C-alpha cells in the first residue's frame, strides 16, 4: 500500500457545490458541519480525478482498476460495482487567501489547519521532521515578517493584533515546507511560493471563523431567454473558494490482489504523471473557466 500527499492550489475560483442553499446563497460551497471549514469531499474529488485520468488517455482497464468501474445508468444509484484500488480523502483547507492593506493579500491559516496537515504527513509516512504547530490566542495573529508585526493589520474584515512567533522554528518551518511541497518553485508558481514564505499568517480561531465566512467569493448570475434576451431565471448566487487557495488530501493506493507488482508499479507511475505539476479541473462551472487547480504530489510513503 502506497500513500500520496496531494496538494491542490487554485488557478481559478473553485465551486464544489453543497446540497442545500443557505439563505440568499443559492449555491454554497461544501463545508464541514462541525467547523465550517471549506472542503472538497472525497466523493466529489474522486470523480474529478477519474475524469482527469480519462482525459489524459488512460486505458479503460487502468481507469477501472484504479478508480473502479463507472456506475451503469440502469444500476442502483450511488452504488459502484467495483471500488477500485485508490482511496481518495477529503481535500481540506491548508491556507485561504485574504485581502490585506499591506502587500495586497496574504494567506490565513490556523492551528486547526496546520494540525490536520501534520496528521496527513504522519499518515503518509513522508521523510523529514514534521514542524510543531504553534499555539495562538483566539483573537490574535502571528507572522514571520516584521512588516506584518509593526502594527495591527487589516486582514479581510478583521483588525488583527500581530506579533512574532514566541518559539523558534515552528511557523517558519511550516511556511517553508508548504511553499516547497504544496506550491513549488517552478517558474509558473515561484513568485507565489516566495510570497507564501513571508505572507503566511497564523490567526486565532475567532478570526479564522470570520475569514472563512467572509473571504470566499460570490457571483450573482441570471439566465436569459435565448429569444427575447430578457431574464428568464434568477438572479442566483454562487459561492467560490478564491484563486490562490491551498488544499491538501491523502491518496492511498492499495496493492492489487496477489501482490501484482507489475500492475502496482504501473498504477503508481500513472498517478505520479497525472497529478504532479498538472492542472486539473474540479467542481462546477467548468465552461466558465472555474475549478482549475495546480496539483502537486509532496511525495509518497507507506503510511496508513
Named regions from a protein language model:
Residues 1-304:
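Basic, Gly/Ser/Thr-rich N-terminal segments that form RNA-phosphate-binding interfaces in CRISPR RAMP
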Amino acid at each position: 500500500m502506497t500513500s500520496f500527499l496531494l496538494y491542490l492550489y487554485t488557478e481559478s475560483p473553485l465551486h464544489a457545490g453543497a446540497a442545500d442553499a443557505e439563505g440568499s446563497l443559492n449555491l454554497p460551497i461544501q463545508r464541514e458541519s462541525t467547523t465550517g471549514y471549506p472542503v472538497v469531499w472525497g466523493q466529489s474529488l474522486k470523480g474529478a480525478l477519474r475524469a482527469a485520468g480519462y482525459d489524459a488517455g488512460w486505458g479503460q482497464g487502468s481507469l477501472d482498476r484504479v478508480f473502479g468501474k463507472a456506475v451503469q445508468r440502469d444500476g442502483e444509484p450511488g452504488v459502484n460495482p467495483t471500488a477500485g484500488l485508490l482511496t481518495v480523502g477529503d481535500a481540506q483547507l491548508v491556507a485561504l487567501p485574504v485581502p490585506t492593506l499591506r502587500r495586497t493579500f496574504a494567506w490565513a491559516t490556523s492551528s486547526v489547519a496546520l494540525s490536520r496537515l501534520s496528521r496527513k504527513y504522519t499518515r503518509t509516512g513522508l521523510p523529514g521532521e514534521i514542524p510543531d504547530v504553534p499555539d495562538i490566542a483566539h483573537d490574535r495573529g502571528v507572522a514571520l515578517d516584521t512588516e506584518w508585526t509593526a502594527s495591527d493589520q487589516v486582514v479581510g474584515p478583521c483588525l488583527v493584533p500581530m506579533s512574532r512567533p514566541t518559539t523558534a522554528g515552528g511557523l517558519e518551518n511550516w511556511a517553508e515546507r508548504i511553499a516547497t511541497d504544496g506550491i513549488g518553485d517552478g517558474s509558473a508558481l515561484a513568485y507565489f511560493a516566495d510570497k507564501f514564505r513571508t505572507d503566511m499568517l497564523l490567526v486565532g480561531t475567532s478570526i479564522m471563523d470570520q475569514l472563512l465566512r467572509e473571504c470566499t467569493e460570490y457571483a450573482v448570475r441570471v439566465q436569459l431567454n435565448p429569444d427575447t434576451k430578457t431574464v428568464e431565471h434568477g438572479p442566483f448566487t454562487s459561492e467560490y473558494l478564491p484563486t490562490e487557495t491551498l488544499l491538501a488530501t491523502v491518496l492511498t493506493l492499495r496493492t492489487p490482489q496477489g501482490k501484482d507488482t507489475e500492475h502496482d508499479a504501473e498504477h503508481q507511475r500513472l498517478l505520479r504523471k497525472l497529478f504532479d505539476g498538472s492542472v486539473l479541473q474540479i467542481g462546477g462551472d467548468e465552461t466558465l473557466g472555474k475549478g482549475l487547480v495546480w496539483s502537486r504530489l509532496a511525495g509518497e510513503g507507506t503510511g496508513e
